[in-house]
Amino acid sequence: MSELIEHANAIEWRFERQILRLEPWGKNSLRVRATCAPEFTSALHALLTPESCQAEILRDAETLTLRNGNISAVLNLKGQLAFYNQRGELLLEEMWRQRSTVGIGASEKSQDKYVSALKLDGREFKPLPGGKYQLTVRFEARQGEKLYGMGQYQQPWLDLKGCSLELAQRNSQASVPFVQSSLGYGLLWNNPAIGEASFAKNHSQWTSRVTQEMDYWITAGDSVMEITRQYAKATGTPPAAPEFISGLWQCKLRYRTQQEVLDVAREYHRRNLPLSVMVIDFFHWPNQGTWCFDPVDWPDPRAMVEELESMGIRLMVSVWPTVEARSPLFPQMKAKGWLVTSDRGVQVNLDFMGNTTFFDATHPQARQFVWDTVKKNYFDYGIKLFWLDEAEPEYRAYDFDNYRYHAGPVLEVGNRYPRDFAQGFYDGLRAEGENEIVNLVRCSWAGSQRYGVLAWSGDVHSSFHSFRNQLAAGLNMGLAGIPWWTTDIGGFQGGNIHDPAFHELLIRWFQWAVFCPVLRMHGYREPRI
């Protein structure tokens, strides 16, 4: 027989090996976890430890209710779960299709009680070798509901109802699994595993391919602003942004030398054109994984920084997570376990301009080592802005089942990599006394915003089709809690500078980009270098 258990400030359901636990987690919010292990892990994932709040617990013969401000969760003896707002209106309910279940939400209150022989549970743990599980969680679909957020996907739809979204990081795709509903709730899938979220007409479904437990956070609010505020309180707010980031950023693939950078900056200054930031792209280094300037082309970085600052221009440099065997740092990083490993085959993650492996951003010591190297070779010259490119990271083949981080297999923890990459630089800058921290990062996960992330949409195509996709991508990134976001004006690849159609695209993209959080030029144009 199942049990409904009251705790001082939480409720639980137990049956066979499964434990379901609900507890208050911030204003008008609940954290919901389930496991088939003897106890829950201590992992917070995207969440921060909340301020203490006392929930109300109500019991009747068949249910336990946990009420925290404007949200209530009702849990019955069969383990079914539904959420309501302060007016008693149904927000969300699990989908069960069993002969013995009739639904705990609105369907139970109707005269037409519906049972099913499909044998589908609202929470499904499928055992995997090694003691982990493949998790599926199902919710009832609601007619007329609109859904927003979830990060950045290359598609034109702002309303995600009807969409199937891969929960994985790819170049131009950022999985930030927080969804906001027009019914007045927000839900964070608090799990960094590779998986899928499907918001179909018949039901919604979340899957994690490898995990130890189910973990999500749900909040209720009467407006998008209220829901977003509660989410930011739960996962972190971005640091104060310096005023200069709202100006023009000059960037391209690529400036090859110190002289090229200074020539462009001097011409802006001569024409009295305001310029906030100049960006030095990749391969200004001697080898991947050295994180320093090549002295042949960049003989005096300190003098370059000082001259740019005299013209009111800040300098940003690109930092890739790639490390090649020719790097003098490779042997130490490999020996210390600071590189991503492969479970099978050759340990090569990306073969762009060399066979490289990514440093393991989930490893605290690896993050510190990379920052210490960056501090010595960039920050100490006066460079305080960093472009964390390839931050997904971008594998040569996205065989997520083949790679392993310090934090665990990529299938289980992979989506946290861009957040941890950003955290290493945020922590390093904070330790040096910096408070206004903004770093350009080519990916995000839930909680990235608290590490000063300015996300951008990656290597998108130079076309009106792609341009249309960015409109939805940027809005949904903001609704997923990543407020600082930008694009490559005109798209990254495919633009012909001699084509009048591309001129039109570039002008329209510029006109729109003025109203984005950051106005940044970038692209791969002729002459190609």
UniProtKB/Swiss-Prot annotation:
Hydrolase as UniProt keyword: yes
EC identifiers of the protein: 3.2.1.-
Pfam families listed in its UniProt record: Gal_mutarotas_2, Glyco_hydro_31_2nd
Active site (UniProt): 389 (nucleophile), 392, 459 (proton donor)
UniProt cross-references to PANTHER family, sorted A to Z: HYDROLASE, PUTATIVE (AFU_ORTHOLOGUE AFUA_1G03140)-RELATED, MALTASE-GLUCOAMYLASE
Keywords of this entry: Glycosidase, Hydrolase
Entry's Gene Ontology BP terms: carbohydrate metabolic process
Example of a GO MF term: carbohydrate binding
Similarity comment: family membership: Belongs to the glycosyl hydrolase 31 family.
InterPro entries according to UniProt: Gal_mutarotase_sf_dom, Glyco_hydro_31_N_dom, Glyco_hydro_31_TIM, Glycoside_hydrolase_SF, Glycosyl_Hydrolase_31
Gene3D superfamilies: Glycosidases, glycosyl hydrolase (family 31)
Name of the protein described by the UniProt record: Uncharacterized family 31 glucosidase ORF2
